[in-house]
Amino acid sequence: MKLGQGITTVVGPNGCGKTNIVDAIRWVLGEQKYRVLRSGKMEDVIFNGAEGTKPLGVCEVSMTVHNNAGKLPIEYNDIEIARRIYRSGDSEYYLNKTQCRLKDIMDLFMDTGMGVDAYSVIELKMIEQILSEMADDRRKMFEE
């Protein structure tokens, strides 16, 4: 899936996977709160199988970010971020196919507006929360 510059919206009927896309982006960027990902535990992101299809032992998401403008503090034009989790609970993170720490990914996106805690990926429930907040709280959020 390719997302262009500017604002991208994902629309579709209920149950078609819109929230799964948002969850995958949050997860690869380092989301640690499994409840944010609509799960009872982190391993729930791994495919549990279906009729005629066996469960998998691993989940992997990768995302490529273009750094042509040099806004990220790394000397690459294209940066691939990947995350894997195994049924054992072990997790791995990668930057450009080199294993790294979660902290390395968090540091890369710090102060860019693109990290896991940023408002660059917004779900409908977050919009509803923003609209119901007091004016001062909304102003602080936009200043972030």
Q: How should each PLM-predicted stretch be described?
A:
Residues 1-144:
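Gly/Lys-enriched N-terminal cap/neck module of very large, oligomeric protein machines
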